[in-house]
């Protein structure tokens, strides 16, 4: 009797686990969901080697273009080119952002605080903090995001 009971329990556990596995494997991966399952998010990634000449520039805003340099579910690196006077309008997102100023001069506003940054400088933006910039001298920013910005890939 005890053996029969253990077999029944084992069978119920197997059925329950099988049902759970099919639920998660059929679950739609929402890359914009900050709680995106690690396994799901890791399935999306760029090639290992990327050459600037092969990467397209995308219009982000007037006078602003971006080039996606590499990504996976947890990280994205984006090169952003600004013309003088271009504005990166104030916005916020759930992603952590760290940016390196590769060239040019920018007036950055982060959470209401304004600073001027030049080539060699950098800044950090915590999740859900309002930030934006004005380009004072044409330049390039190297943005890193965690997790990746699925919206930049057209995945919503």
Residue locations for each model-derived region?
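Short acidic-glycine-tyrosine-enriched beta hairpin
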Residues: 113-127
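Conserved short histidine dyad/triad with adjacent acidic residue
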Residues: 76-92
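Glycine- and acidic-residue-biased ligand/ion/polar-headgroup-sensing regions
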Residues: 94-106, 111
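Bacterial Sec-dependent N-terminal signal peptides
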Residues: 1-24
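Ligand-binding loop in jelly-roll beta-barrel domains
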Residues: 127-151
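A cytosolic small-molecule/anion-sensing beta-strand core signal
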Residues: 102-103, 118-119, 137
């Amino acid at each position: 009797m005890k053996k029969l009971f253990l077999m029944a329990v084992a069978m119920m556990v197997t059925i329950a686990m099988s049902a759970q596995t099919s639920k998660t494997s059929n679950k739609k991966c929402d890359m914009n969901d900050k709680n995106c399952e690690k396994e799901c998010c890791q399935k999306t990634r760029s090639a290992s080697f990327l050459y600037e000449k092969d990467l397209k520039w995308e219009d982000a805003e007037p006078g602003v273009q971006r080039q996606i340099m590499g990504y996976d579910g947890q990280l994205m690196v984006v090169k952003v080119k600004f013309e003088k006077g271009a504005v990166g309008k104030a916005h916020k997102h759930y992603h952590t952002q760290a940016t390196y100023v590769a060239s040019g001069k920018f007036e950055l506003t982060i959470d209401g605080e304004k600073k001027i940054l030049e080539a060699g400088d950098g800044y950090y933006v915590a999740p859900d903090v309002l930030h934006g910039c004005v380009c004072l001298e044409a330049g390039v920013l190297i943005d890193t995001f965690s997790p990746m910005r699925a919206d930049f890939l057209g995945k919503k």
